[in-house]
A protein has these predicted regions:
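Conserved Class I SAM-dependent methyltransferase catalytic core
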Residues: 9, 15, 20-22, 142-172
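Residue-level signal for pocket-adjacent positions within structured domains
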Residues: 5-6, 92, 126, 130
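Active-site-adjacent beta-strand anchor residues
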Residues: 68, 138, 165
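Glycine-centered small-residue hotspots that permit tight backbone geometry or close packing
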Residues: 17, 74, 137-141
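Mobile active-site "lid"/loop adjacent to the S-adenosyl-L-methionine
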Residues: 116-144
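Class I SAM-dependent transferase core
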Residues: 1-31
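Glycine- and other small-residue-rich loops at beta-strand/loop junctions that grip anionic moieties
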Residues: 9, 42, 137, 141
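Conserved SAM/SAH cofactor-binding pocket of Class I
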Residues: 21-125
């Protein structure tokens, strides 16, 4: 459903996306035990990860999905991915990480997934509302990750889970 021209504006699912999907699929028994009713994907790009999870989780319960991306094109493509895959109970928000959302989500999110921009780049690139923001991780590829991490514990409910894809250069 995504036109090849749109991939010039959003993060095209790549090896890291498919690795993340494989890892999440292996976790599905645990994820179903968590019984997430609110799934948050930060930086969805095309929306394939939250669409995939919603379908897997839906077998055991209904799940509402919120996707947040700084890139408006990614928001539009994610919404279309949800619609074309019949992903129910979704909302797509254009925002820089959790700006303006953290207080409303406090202690409400059951599951967070984030395939962050982790490529080491100049710091300024991490704030661009365009395709560059999809890979620009700043110094050591950690700046975007480090801006988000302080908010995670406040938005996760007790027993909630956070899945974050990292790579060696990020010094996890």
């Amino acid at each position: 459903h995504i036109d090849w021209k749109e991939y010039a504006k959003i993060y095209e699912p790549d090896q890291d996306s498919f690795l993340f999907l494989d890892a999440l699929e292996k976790e599905i028994s645990f994820i179903q035990q968590v019984q997430p009713s609110l799934l948050l994907e930060i930086g969805p790009g095309s929306g394939i990860i939250s669409t995939f999870l919603s379908r897997l989780i839906r077998t055991s319960n209904s799940v509402a999905t919120i996707a947040i991306d700084i890139n408006m094109d990614a928001c539009l493509v994610t919404r279309r991915t949800y619609q074309q895959n019949g992903t129910p109970y979704t909302d797509v928000v254009r925002s820089n990480l959790l700006s303006g959302m953290a207080s409303r989500l406090q202690n409400k999110v059951d599951m967070i997934v984030f395939n962050p921009p982790y490529v080491p780049t100049e710091s300024e690139e991490t704030f661009l509302p365009s395709i560059e923001s999809a890979y620009a991780g700043g110094v050591r590829g950690r700046e975007v990750i480090d801006r988000l991490l302080p908010d995670i514990s406040s938005i996760l409910r007790t027993g909630g889970v956070f899945y974050l894809l990292l790579e060696r250069e990020n010094n996890p």
